[in-house]
């Protein structure tokens, strides 16, 4: 691979050259799938011996739990050796290892991959299967949730090269007892949301818990309005320098929202030093009236929801603006890719087997939503059944800014959004600064 491509990958992973050279072994557990994939999986007669897989996961991760059972059962049925897993839990270490496999053209049969620079690099070497075509082949394309499928569409050609790990959806939990105390209803617009926050604060309640130490949490509030109003148009136009925060109505709505939430005291005290674990403990421990959460916290919410203490609502509409119909951020997690160079008949059989049994693994083994619109089994937590109507007909995926922006601009905006939330600058000052970041970092 050319050094230009390598440099792009390093930038996408936030890595340095020294990290690339020294970090490839850190954080690995399980067997190694090193060497040329065709050599490690085939015998002397060329017949496949086993299936190799690289995952950004630990042994407790939902994706590992699902794939471990599927691959093990399939391998036993086909008389193959047990599947060979290589697990790396750290993000930076995983990116490093995947880059090495791509650069040396030795990708395993199956590997985890983000939709962006890494999937593009795998596509450049012919190392990634068109998942959309394969879903069509096995008759499962129309069974997949449309928003999850949309999440993995390639920005260059519109094809889908990654299989979702699950259907993940995000929404707000709220304390029903607190809302009832002040005769409040779940807000459907941001003006209603802010009015609710004001009522709660005026009565001595903490309106909203936020994990302000996590960059993505504050950025959600910055990007909610642009997402509801433009989907990905604003952020992509901003990156291409075709749109600015200062002149885009959706972007200005987002900046105003974050500024108001922070400066009016609607977040908990010390929110910038609160990480996700601490914020979770605060809310489910009885602090705060609202919390931006998601399907990954069904377990934590289960008892309170069963006792009638919790309700949920979707991302509110932007008042006076045209909002897209989808109002629940939906994404497919870290994608799964199949190596086109080792995608033989056995792997094609496994893909079909995986699609036909994936929902079972999601619900029975991992307790997550399936990316397929299959009927849910009985006996799940009630939240699974009650949340499903939020997304079952959704067509548009969530658009996350933190995996679209270059690393320098992302760092700049993260620093600036903290100033905005603290009231150290006005929305107009934030917008002007953000507009300059993309110009400076493109030089």
Task: Please give the residue ranges for each predicted region.
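Glycine-centered hinge/linker elements that transmit conformational signals in sensory
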Residues: 199-200, 240-271
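Extracytoplasmic/periplasmic solute-binding protein
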Residues: 157-165, 170, 194-243
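Conserved N-terminal structural module of periplasmic/extracytoplasmic solute-binding proteins
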Residues: 8-9, 19-120, 124-125, 137-139, ...
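Conserved C-terminal helix/tail region of periplasmic/extracytoplasmic solute-binding proteins
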Residues: 82, 180, 202, 340, ...
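Extracytoplasmic/periplasmic substrate-recognition and gating elements
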Residues: 49, 72-73, 77, 81-84, ...
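A structural signal for short loop-to-beta-strand junctions that line the ligand-binding cleft
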Residues: 100-101, 108-109, 138-177, 206-209, ...
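Hinge/lid segment of periplasmic solute-binding proteins
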Residues: 114-171, 185, 194, 221, ...
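Extracytoplasmic/periplasmic substrate-binding proteins
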Residues: 55-56, 63-71, 118-120, 256-341
């Amino acid at each position: 691979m050319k050094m230009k491509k390598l440099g792009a990958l390093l930038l996408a992973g936030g890595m340095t050259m020294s990290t690339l050279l020294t970090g490839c072994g850190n954080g690995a557990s399980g067997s190694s799938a090193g060497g040329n994939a065709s050599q490690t999986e085939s015998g002397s007669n060329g017949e496949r011996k086993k299936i190799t897989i690289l995952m950004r996961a630990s042994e407790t991760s939902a994706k590992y739990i699902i794939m471990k059972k599927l691959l093990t059962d399939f391998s036993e049925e086909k008389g193959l050796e047990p599947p060979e897993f290589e697990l790396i839990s750290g993000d930076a270490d995983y990116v490093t290892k995947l880059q090495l496999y791509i650069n040396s053209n030795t990708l395993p049969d199956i590997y985890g991959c983000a939709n962006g620079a890494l999937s593009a690099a795998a596509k450049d070497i012919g190392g990634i299967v068109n998942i959309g075509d394969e879903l069509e082949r096995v008759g499962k394309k129309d069974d997949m949730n449309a928003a999850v499928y949309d999440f993995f569409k390639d920005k260059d050609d519109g094809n889908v090269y990654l299989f979702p790990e699950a259907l993940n959806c995000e929404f707000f939990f709220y304390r029903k007892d607190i809302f009832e105390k002040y005769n409040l209803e779940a807000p459907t617009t941001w003006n209603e949301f802010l009015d609710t926050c004001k009522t709660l604060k005026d009565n001595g309640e903490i309106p909203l818990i936020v994990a302000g130490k996590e960059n993505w949490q504050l950025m959600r509030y910055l990007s909610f309005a642009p997402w509801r109003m433009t989907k990905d148009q604003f952020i992509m136009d901003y990156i291409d320098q075709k749109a600015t925060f200062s002149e885009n109505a959706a972007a200005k709505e987002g900046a105003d929202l974050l500024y108001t939430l922070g400066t009016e005291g609607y977040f908990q005290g010390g929110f910038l030093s609160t990480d996700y674990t601490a914020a979770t403990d605060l809310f489910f421990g009885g602090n705060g009236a609202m919390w931006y959460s998601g399907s990954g916290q069904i377990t934590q919410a289960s008892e309170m929801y069963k006792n009638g203490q919790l309700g949920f609502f979707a991302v509110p509409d932007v008042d006076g603006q045209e909002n897209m119909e989808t109002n629940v951020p939906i994404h497919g997690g870290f994608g799964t890719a199949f190596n086109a160079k080792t995608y033989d008949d056995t792997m094609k059989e496994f893909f079909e087997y995986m699609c036909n049994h994936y929902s079972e693994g999601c619900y029975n083994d991992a307790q997550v939503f399936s990316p397929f619109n299959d009927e849910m089994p009985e006996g799940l937590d009630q939240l699974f059944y009650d949340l499903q109507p939020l997304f079952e007909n959704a067509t548009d995926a969530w658009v996350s800014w933190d995996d679209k922006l270059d690393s320098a601009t992302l760092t700049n905006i993260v620093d600036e959004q903290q100033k905005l939330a603290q009231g150290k600058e006005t929305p107009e000052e934030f917008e002007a600064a953000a507009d300059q970041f993309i110009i400076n970092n493109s030089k």
